Amino acid sequence: MEFYASLKSIAMHAPSECIKNVAFQEFLDTSDEWIEKRTGIKERRFASVGEKSSDLGVIAAKQAIERAHLTPQDIDLVVVATLSPDFLAMPSTACVLSAKLGIENKPAFDISAACTGFIYLLSVAKAYVESGMYENVLIVGAEKTSSVLDFKDRGTCILFGDGAGACVIGRTKHLKESILDVQISANGNFSNYLYTPRTLKPTPFNAKEETSDPFLCMKGNEVFKLAVKTLLKDVEMILEKNALKPEDVRLFIPHQANLRIIQAVREHLDFKDEQVVLTVHKYGNTSAASIPMAMGEAYEEGRLKKGDLMLLDAFGGGLTWGSALVYFGGS
């Protein structure tokens, strides 16, 4: 291989409106202590009424492109992961975001892998770059999860937040600046564990019209148990496959769904506190945006530097899951 795919830049964006746990006490049977004890979440950000996922994503994308020392016209492909797209069926959020960036006549499409979306993005971008088809791929995890939440459901609405993270994937000749490995999986037999109901109208030929709210539904206990079991196995697998140990990893950046899930994986693999990046307490679960937002924050805080090896993992609706070993190829 003449070159490898490389994560050249990372940027994140969080909306300005900060919603603390106490805000939910006004309309739900809950408390700040109850939420934090069970999830580790203290606050989250919500986008404004007029903002969409693409609006959040374009802010992160512009900064990622700038940090890669490129212009929007240098981008060959745009891929967005989201469970809260701007439009229900079409156009894709990637197309909308491309237009807002001023990118024309370049391919753009969405990926639907829920909270595992960013790992899927890495897999797709790595394949396209290393095949030689595209040189610079913009990947964006952008979510306005607040648009799909039922604020009468204590089990879901307290968990999620809005935000976006973006990366430019380019080329490198150096293995230790590359996306070393990505593994993704899914099992649709558990699709009813985490989903949003069908919202498209039935055909006029249906004898009985069925409608449902477009709100996120989750079997919390079942998802928690499967997530811990699956992620432990998946992370062990990717480390063993690449002959690496936890101590070889500079930063462990998991999907920020629930502090208890993160701690279970961290303790099992004996990661030190300084290796683990945590943002769940301040942003909640931002689905496909959570990993790039955590990466972006680590970069901005000076914790992530060129050549650092990151271990990423995620689990989400589908059910989907995946992990990645990524050297930071930026500066």
Swiss-Prot record:
Coiled coil: none
Subcellular location: Cytoplasm
Keyword Membrane (UniProt): no
Keywords: Acyltransferase, Cytoplasm, Fatty acid biosynthesis, Fatty acid metabolism, Lipid biosynthesis, Lipid metabolism, Multifunctional enzyme, Transferase
GO MF, any single term: beta-ketoacyl-acyl-carrier-protein synthase III activity
Residues the record marks as active site: C115, H255, N285
Pfam families, per database record: ACP_syn_III, ACP_syn_III_C
Gene3D superfamilies: 3.40.47.10
Any one GO CC term of the record: cytoplasm
Origin superkingdom: Bacteria
Enzymatic reactions: malonyl-[ACP] + acetyl-CoA + H(+) = 3-oxobutanoyl-[ACP] + CO2 + CoA
EC number(s) from the headed UniProt entry: 2.3.1.180
Pathway the protein acts in: Lipid metabolism; fatty acid biosynthesis
Region annotation (ACP-binding) ranges: 256-260
Its job: Catalyzes the condensation reaction of fatty acid synthesis by the addition to an acyl acceptor of two carbons from malonyl-ACP. Catalyzes the first condensation reaction which initiates fatty acid synthesis and may therefore play a role in governing the total rate of fatty acid production. Possesses both acetoacetyl-ACP synthase and acetyl transacylase activities. Its substrate specificity determines the biosynthesis of branched-chain and/or straight-chain of fatty acids.
Entries under NCBIfam families matching the protein: fabH, PRK09352.1
Domain notes: The last Arg residue of the ACP-binding site is essential for the weak association between ACP/AcpP and FabH.
PANTHER family per the UniProt record, alphabetical: 3-OXOACYL-[ACYL-CARRIER-PROTEIN] SYNTHASE 3, BETA-KETOACYL-[ACYL-CARRIER-PROTEIN] SYNTHASE III
Subunit and partners: Homodimer.
The protein, known as: Beta-ketoacyl-[acyl-carrier-protein] synthase III
Annotated source species: Helicobacter acinonychis (strain Sheeba)
